[in-house]
Curated annotation (Swiss-Prot):
Its main location: cytoplasm. It comes from Acinetobacter baumannii (strain ACICU). One of its GO terms (cellular component) is cytoplasm. SUPFAM superfamilies: S-adenosyl-L-methionine-dependent methyltransferases. InterPro entries: DNA_methylase_N6_adenine_CS, Mtase_sm_N, rRNA_ssu_MeTfrase_C, RsmC/RlmG, SAM-dependent_MTases_sf, Small_mtfrase_dom. It holds the Pfam family MTS_N. Signal peptide: none annotated. Monomer. The keyword rRNA processing applies. This is Ribosomal RNA small subunit methyltransferase C.
Amino acid sequence: MDPRSEVILRQHDYLKGRVLLINAPNDALVSQLPTEIDASVWTWNYADYQGFLNAGATAHFSVEFPLQEFDQAIIFVPKSKELLNYILHVVMSHLKIDQSVFLVGEKKGGVERAAKQLQSFGKILKLDSARHCQLWHLKIEKTEKIKPLESWLKTYTVQVNEQELTICALPGVFSQTHLDVGTAVLLPYLNQVKSGRIADFGCGAGIISCYLAKANSSNIIHALDIDAFALQSTEMTFSRNGIGSDQLRLQPVTGIADAPTELDAIVSNPPFHQGIHTNYDASEGLCQNAKKHLKASGELWIVANRFLNYPILIEKHFGQCEIKTDLQGFKVLYACA
């Protein structure tokens, strides 16, 4: 069990009524809480969401606070400071004065910094500190008026092969405020991608998806991501750039296995972080299994850190892998099914 969940279980006497667990890890916490606690989970991680449903828990997969009332909330501190700001805001917009909010996180994950942010809503108390985790309690003294989701957007402009795109990114989305180096290395090659049904695996804020849609109005883009904030950001990016929704298919995925089949191309700057930890499972799975989702002669385009052994993985499953460029620590890899 996640050590943060162990801390919650040890202090479960503080919990009562309808309790919302926010950003909770996918473990046995909900099933081990006392039955008199009516626990629900709000998550934006699709893999975790599926895990909670399979375990029989009440779970919500969304970027917005669930549409029901709660007596208490437990916030598992996210990696992103901006995302924590958003979560605190929506919690303080939905809970009432004198209700309880709990904050739990790893010390290396910024729980002490997060606790300081909690202080602006009332007096806080540290309830537990063990297994490199801390649990804090707040009795709400100050609430907030809900702001629209759009007010949390960051926008910036990207120039791609003579096309100017406006990128919209919500809190917690990869490269929320600027173009990342890996995607920048990949962008000049997007005009070579085969037209048709194209999947953007790990779509993030929708930079790759948006360019491919604007480049050819007959392209159908399957924007795939595990994160609800990424999918919502991609939809907002399409809208901001005047691209019709008929070109966009948004799909939450746990990995490449959930992707559509018979695709003309898969393009990806694959994810490698899960919370504060590095995790290459999704990107390695993409290299190993992408061919199953492509038509004959379908294309795989990936940008990845040069130190990763993806060319070997891709060659093993495709029979070949071409390195299109090696620039600024990143390689653009190409293979044809």
